[in-house]
Regions:
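N-terminal intrinsically disordered/low-complexity leader segments
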Residues: 1-7, 143-144
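All-alpha amphipathic helical-bundle segments outside canonical DNA-binding/catalytic cores
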Residues: 119-123, 137-151
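Solvent-exposed, amphipathic alpha-helical segments
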Residues: 15-22, 69, 73, 102-105, ...
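Hydrophobic alpha-helical connector segments
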Residues: 57, 70-100, 128-131, 145-149
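Amphipathic alpha-helical segments used for helix-helix packing
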Residues: 95-122
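Helix-turn-helix
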Residues: 8-11, 15-57
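Short alpha-helical functional segments enriched in proximate histidine and acidic residues
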Residues: 19, 65, 131, 135
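Short, basic, alpha-helical segments at the C-terminal edge of helix-turn-helix-like DNA-binding modules
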Residues: 60-66
Length: 151
């Protein structure tokens, strides 16, 4: 993809993240996104394929990428502290309130099994928990890491 196309796609994703956070998935139309970025609805679809494709990209590429980076960094550490992971996550989320708002809004909507992000949210915590459980955390003797992470 050429730089201009990458920039335009990022602009579309940013608009979608903001609108999904404010209006939810069902309240956000492709036309609203198109109006926000100065394209036609067909122009938006050229970059993202479908509204569900846009939702997936907003969650995977915009929201999850930073969280995954934190877990990847922690996995490389010999004996990380669980509290350090939470501090990093809080610090990242404090810098991205719009993305956190989107995540919160969509997770509430996705309780409905017919929501297009239902599976994503059903599996999201399981994936992160599995990753976290495979890290050799530095915890005091006798502390159940699984129980601590699930608290």
């Amino acid at each position: 993809m050429a730089n201009e196309e990458v920039d335009r796609r990022a602009e579309i994703l940013n608009a979608a993240v903001e609108l999904f956070g404010t209006l939810g998935y069902y309240g956000t139309s492709l036309q609203k996104i198109a109006d926000r970025v100065g394209l036609t609805k067909a122009g938006v679809l050229h970059y993202v394929g479908s509204k569900e494709g846009l939702l997936t990209a907003a969650l995977d590429e915009v929201y999850d990428s930073e969280t995954e980076d934190i877990l990847t960094d922690i996995v490389r550490e010999p004996r990380p502290l669980i509290a350090d992971m939470w501090r990093r996550i809080v610090a990242v989320n404090a810098r991205r309130p719009i993305q956190v708002h989107m995540f919160s809004t969509l997770s509430a909507e996705a309780i409905d099994p017919n929501h297009p992000a239902h599976e994503y949210f059903a599996n999201h915590e399981l994936h992160n928990a599995d990753t976290a459980l495979n890290i050799r955390w530095q915890v005091p003797e006798g502390v159940d890491t699984r129980r601590l992470l699930n608290a």
